[in-house]
A protein has these predicted regions:
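Nucleotide-activated sugar donor-binding and catalytic core shared by glycosyltransferases
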Residues: 1-218, 223-359
Length: 359
């Protein structure tokens, strides 16, 4: 969302943009926003230790609803499939305020996979007045659901805007210092907690053991359950680095340094192909099939044998690796935020410079 906020604020003489955080994963969010010179204008501070998803949702809804009542915005914008976006859409709907959904139309068509993200984005799509799907495939999903074509605008993904801007930050050091190949593992999705995540970690460990030149780097999610499992399986190995979540520019540089990525992250599925990096997707389904169709990503699920087989194939077969590494990214050209800005202001009756459509 940061590139969208920056783009809207280029025209701050025409409209005020208020950046709101619910306060989830505050340290990670603030570090990411600082990359773009941003801080939240409002932090609702909803997080409490040990609270349930229902409690997070309730507190976020109360906070956003109160803020909408106080500030009376002309439009609420939410991005992606988070609980915050779901709640923002619901609060805007209750207040009869228009809602715009950035990264709209992603679907697995399985309501609880990923959980709760598939539900979150479907609800956001139900109430949205403006839909900004990143690709034509996502736009087709919206059309099949009966959304009005005149409210759907394909923009490319704003995450590509962010990753390309961060990659241009030449002051960020390359990481890590390792002469051999680097493999990146990111795993945090709720549906992978427990046994699936253990299988993922064991598969990654086996790949490190098979290939003596490989260093595995694992940024650890703040959730204690995730961290404890990763440490129990992967801790103590000289060629495995368990690290705190890096600041966004460092994470981008880390991706650029890698040879291969194993991830259950939706964002990483989109970002890695921008650098020609193969991604093994640690999920059974994906709402981002464009990368799979383009050859930049492969679904491997959470089966240990399948992860090891596909990882070893890419690390051991140069031709197989080249086929995935040379595929073209289908997710954007770095101008998605400008397209969002143009359509948002158009919706509000304000004229700003147009941008060539993304196809």
């Amino acid at each position: 969302m940061a590139p969208v906020v920056l783009e809207l604020r280029r025209f701050e003489d025409l409209a005020e943009t208020l950046l709101v955080s619910t306060g989830q994963h505050d340290a990670i969010l603030l570090a990411a926003l600082s990359t773009f010179g941003l801080t939240p204008d409002v932090d609702l501070g909803i997080m409490r230790h040990g609270q349930s998803l229902a409690q997070v949702t309730t507190r976020a809804l109360d906070g956003i609803a109160s803020l909408i009542e106080e500030r009376k915005p002309s439009l609420v914008i939410g991005q992606g499939d988070t609980t915050t976006t779901f709640v923002a859409a619901l609060a805007a709907f209750y207040a009869r305020v228009p809602f715009a959904h950035v990264e709209a139309g992603l679907r697995t068509n399985t309501i609880d996979n990923p959980f709760p993200e598939e539900f979150n984005r479907r609800v956001a799509g139900l109430v949205a007045d403006l839909h900004f799907p990143p690709t034509s495939w996502a736009a087709d999903n919206l059309l099949k659901e009966g959304k009005e074509p005149e409210r759907i605008f394909v923009t490319g993904n704003t995450g590509i805007d962010a990753v390309l801007e961060a990659a241009e930050n030449t002051q960020t050091p390359w990481y890590p210092d390792h002469e051999g190949r680097v493999v990146l593992l990111t795993t945090h999705r709720r549906e992978n907690w427990g046994d699936p995540q253990r299988r993922i970690a064991e598969a990654a460990l086996e790949l490190v053991q098979r290939f003596p030149d490989v260093l595995l780097v694992v940024p650890m999610h703040p959730n204690p359950q995730v961290r404890e499992l990763l440490v129990s399986v992967l801790g103590g190995h000289e060629r495995i680095q368990l690290i705190e979540p890096p600041e966004y520019p460092n994470f981008v540089k880390l991706m650029q340094r890698c040879k291969l990525i194993l991830s259950d992250s939706g964002g990483v599925q989109e970002e890695a192909p921008a650098f020609g990096l193969p991604v093994l997707v640690l999920r059974d389904t994906t709402e981002r099939p464009e990368g799979v169709h383009a050859g930049t990503a492969k679904l491997v699920g959470t089966d240990k044998r399948e992860i090891v087989e596909q990882g070893a194939r890419l690390l051991g077969d140069p031709e197989a690796y080249r086929e995935m590494a040379q595929a073209v990214s289908p997710y954007g050209d770095g101008h998605a935020s400008a397209r969002v800005r143009y359509r948002v202001f158009e919706f509000l009756g304000i004229e700003t410079p147009s941008v060539e459509d993304w196809n």
